[in-house]
Regions:
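Extreme N-terminal, non-catalytic leader segments
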Residues: 1-18, 23-46, 50-94
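Beta-strand-loop-alpha "switch" segments that mediate conformational coupling across diverse proteins
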Residues: 277-306, 318
């Protein structure tokens, strides 16, 4: 794994109020640019890690202004040094496409195959992961942003060892966080991710600042789209916005609520063709999930489909999709699934 060698700092300059220690020769404009452009890599350190933060600041400065690296190259290198879990974002251009259902069941599939998994509800102002998971959290992201608790204190336990961080619902100000708040939240997520093998991000729908901010963390981005034409168009809009924002994660299409494979194929082909033609982007086909009464029944009963109907076609296809990200996660045996279903009955 790539290791960054911080620029030597001797003697260590006095800390500024914001925790950085720019060298006397640094231009103020450069300091401000680094603080704004790389905020997610400079936040989340406690007081005992101040020197680490200083070293990182100087390393960024030297790569940027001495070695001529681009901001994208620096961000990629910094991400490579983070010993953290793999970030998989589940997003959509339009609401009502089953995004949260996919995120919850995908995260649970990872947890069921033994991966340390965290599910983060990133639909900050209109969160509902906790509803589908059957949880009533005492602490949410709202408490974190109001500085009442640390992000790690907002983690709650779900089924199969799955851990979740729940959002708040109906809190308008969470849907309009400023850049500093979003960068601080991202920084805390990166620190917390060192304790997990995979972090699933259930983003909000659309292309708002909150959505794109979370997508900057993602190694892979699952774009959920349905056969509905508006959903397909909005899914392309999300991919295009990610391209224009220079999101580095790999995009993939998951066709949801399809009546059969042929209908799902149309969705995937439309999106992959448009991305290749107009954006010169290669977008993966992640598979498809059927429209099924059991899915809605599971949501209404506040349980995941993998718990309530583990042998269903939806559950089997979901595990296959999970195995595409983490090999071995599709091997949750049919016998184990049958036992769960029998117990539920």
């Amino acid at each position: 794994m790539l290791r960054l060698q911080p620029a030597p700092v001797s003697p260590t300059p006095a800390l500024e109020s914001n925790g950085t220690a720019p060298r006397p020769s640094l231009e103020l404009s450069r300091v401000q640019f680094i603080q704004q452009e790389f905020a997610s890599f400079l936040t989340g350190f406690d007081s005992s890690q101040a020197v680490v933060r200083i070293d990182r600041f100087h390393w960024i400065h030297d790569r940027l202004f001495i070695d001529g690296w681009s901001p994208e190259q620096i961000s990629q290198a910094l991400r490579a040094t983070e010993i953290r879990g793999r970030f998989i974002a589940v997003s959509s251009g339009k609401g009502g496409v089953g995004k949260t259902t996919v995120a919850l069941n995908l995260a649970l599939a990872f947890a069921q195959c033994g991966r340390r998994t965290l599910l983060f509800d990133g639909d900050l102002g209109m969160a509902n992961v906790h509803v589908y998971a059957g949880l009533n959290p005492a602490v949410t992201v709202l408490d974190v942003l109001d500085r009442r608790v640390a992000l790690s204190d907002a983690v709650v336990s779900g089924p199969a060892g799955l851990k979740l961080i729940c959002g708040a619902s109906g809190v308008a100000r969470l849907a309009s966080l400023d850049r500093r708040q979003l960068e601080e939240l991202n920084g805390q997520l990166c620190r917390l991710a060192t304790q997990y093998d995979v972090v699933v991000l259930d983003t909000g729908a659309g292309i708002g600042r909150e959505v794109l901010s979370l997508l900057t963390l993602a190694d892979e981005i699952v774009v959920v789209a349905t056969p509905n034409l508006a959903s397909t168009l909005d899914a392309y809009g999300l991919i295009k916005a990610g391209y224009e924002a220079r999101i580095l994660g790999s995009f993939g299409i998951l066709a949801n609520l399809a009546k059969d494979q042929a209908e799902a194929r149309v969705v995937v082909e439309r999106l992959t063709t448009c991305a290749a033609r107009f954006l010169q982007m290669s977008v993966r086909n992640l598979g498809w999930l059927p429209r099924a009464p059991r899915v809605e029944a599971a949501n209404q009963s506040r349980r995941s489909v993998l718990e309530s109907s583990p042998s269903s076609d939806f559950a089997k296809r979901l595990r296959t999709i999970a195995a595409g990200f983490l090999p071995g996660c599709g091997s949750h045996t049919s016998s184990a699934a049958s036992k769960q279903e029998s117990a539920a009955a």
